[in-house]
Structure formats: structure tokens, C-alpha cells
Regions:
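Structural motif
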Residues: 38-43, 130-142
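Extended, histidine- and acidic-residue-enriched regions that form the cofactor-binding/catalytic faces
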Residues: 144-181
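Short, flexible loop segments at boundaries between secondary-structure elements
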Residues: 94, 131-132, 172-194
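N-terminal glycine-rich anion-binding loop in soluble enzyme alpha/beta folds
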Residues: 1-36, 102-133
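Conserved mixed alpha/beta catalytic, RNA-binding, or beta-rich assembly cores of soluble enzyme
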Residues: 62-67, 72-108, 113-115, 123, ...
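Short, solvent-exposed amphipathic alpha-helical segments in soluble enzyme
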Residues: 114-119, 168-170, 192
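N-terminal glycine-rich phosphate/adenylate-binding segment common to multiple enzyme folds
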Residues: 36-82, 150-164
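Short hydrophobic/aromatic-enriched beta-strand-loop microsegments
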Residues: 77-83, 119-127, 171-180
Length: 194
């Protein structure tokens, strides 16, 4: 990943969140979490993408659901969850309200742009996928259900099947897991006959 092999000081210097700028929450290799500046991460992802292409990678999947608008590959097939998920979720839920769980609050204008494919504006709640236990996730899922959500989307690659099961048990609603959707769509796109 972009932050691999960087010290905490280097991460803070190069990727530290800036006031009034979009942030992301990410998990480091040691299991700790850190908030980072989204635009700085996008620059780092672009650099990493070029390195991967130079190393011969022909397919690159971004393992983050954050919005990246400027990523460009020279020849690799670039798969970006933020471009797949809105259209896929919009097509799946149709005229139903989606409750979106995410690790950090997203500014309203950014959320509107990202989820414009949905027929009904979504409701949103914050729950870290990196917290111990499932209490935050289940509380957020209940809040979304109370707000009228007919289905839930866990909009971060950090959410796991355990989180999905906890939210589904708590609410009885269908729960879409971003990592699962991205993996299935990517697998379908890359299938080659034996």
C-alpha cells in the first residue's frame, strides 16, 4: 500500500490530514489506524499505480472505496471501487433507501456526488471497521434502519463478513459489503475460459 514502510512521522508529514480537507481512515500493517489527507493519498496511489505497471502488473484493483478522480493507468486495467459501487448499488436497490456505513463522515456535497446514481438520497452513519467488537457497527446499522433504510451498504474495504453478519442480525436488512461486491465484479470482468 501507499503507506507501507513509512514511519509514523513520515505518514504525518506526507499524508497528515489538513483542516477542512477530505480525510480517509486506513489501517496500517501493524494493525493501528490513522486518518490521512485524501488528496495526498490519491497522489500516492497514482505513484504506486505507475510502480505496479512498471513491475509488469496488467490489472490493478484499488483496495479503497474513497473517491479518486484523477487516477490514470498507462496500460493496466484499473479497477476503482468508487466508480463501480454507486452504479451497482443504484441498480440493485432501485427505488429503496440505502443506509451507508462509512468509517468517517463524508461532507454532504461529496456524498451527493458519489451517490448520485441512487434514486433516493441515502442516509449515512459512521462506524469504524477497525474498532474492537461490533458495537459501533450494530449501533450505526440500527440508526440507519430507524432512519428508513431498506438496505445497508458497508462503504469501506475494511468492513468484513463479520461486520455484515452483525448488521444483518441486528436489523434483518440486506447488507451489501463493498469488498464482496468489488471482488465479485472484478472476478467476473477478469474471467477467462479454461
Amino acid at each position: 500500500g501507499v503507506l507501507d514502510r513509512l514511519s509514523d512521522a513520515d505518514i504525518a508529514l506526507q499524508f497528515g490530514p489538513r483542516p477542512r480537507e477530505q480525510r480517509m481512515l486506513t489501517r496500517l500493517l501493524d494493525g493501528s489506524t490513522v486518518e490521512v489527507d485524501a488528496r495526498a493519498v490519491e497522489t500516492g496511489v497514482q505513484r504506486k499505480l505507475l510502480e505496479l505497471e512498471d513491475a509488469g502488473c496488467t490489472v490493478v484493483v484499488v483496495l479503497c472505496t474513497g473517491v479518486f478522480r484523477g487516477l490514470r493507468s498507462r496500460r493496466a486495467w484499473l479497477i476503482e471501487p468508487d466508480r463501480i459501487l454507486p452504479a451497482l448499488v443504484g441498480g440493485l436497490v432501485g427505488p429503496r433507501r440505502v443506509g451507508i456505513l462509512s468509517p468517517l463522515e463524508m461532507p454532504i456535497d461529496a456524498a451527493r456526488r458519489k451517490w448520485a446514481a441512487l434514486q433516493i438520497p441515502p442516509s449515512a452513519a459512521v462506524a469504524s471497521p477497525y474498532a474492537a467488537g461490533d458495537d459501533g457497527v450494530t449501533a450505526a446499522a440500527r440508526d440507519l434502519q430507524r432512519s428508513g433504510a431498506n438496505a445497508l451498504l458497508m462503504d469501506c474495504i475494511g468492513y468484513t463478513e463479520r461486520h455484515r453478519a452483525a448488521a444483518a442480525r441486528t436489523t434483518g436488512l440486506p447488507v451489501l459489503l463493498a469488498s464482496d461486491l468489488v471482488a465479485r465484479v472484478t472476478g467476473a470482468c477478469l474471467y477467462k475460459a479454461p
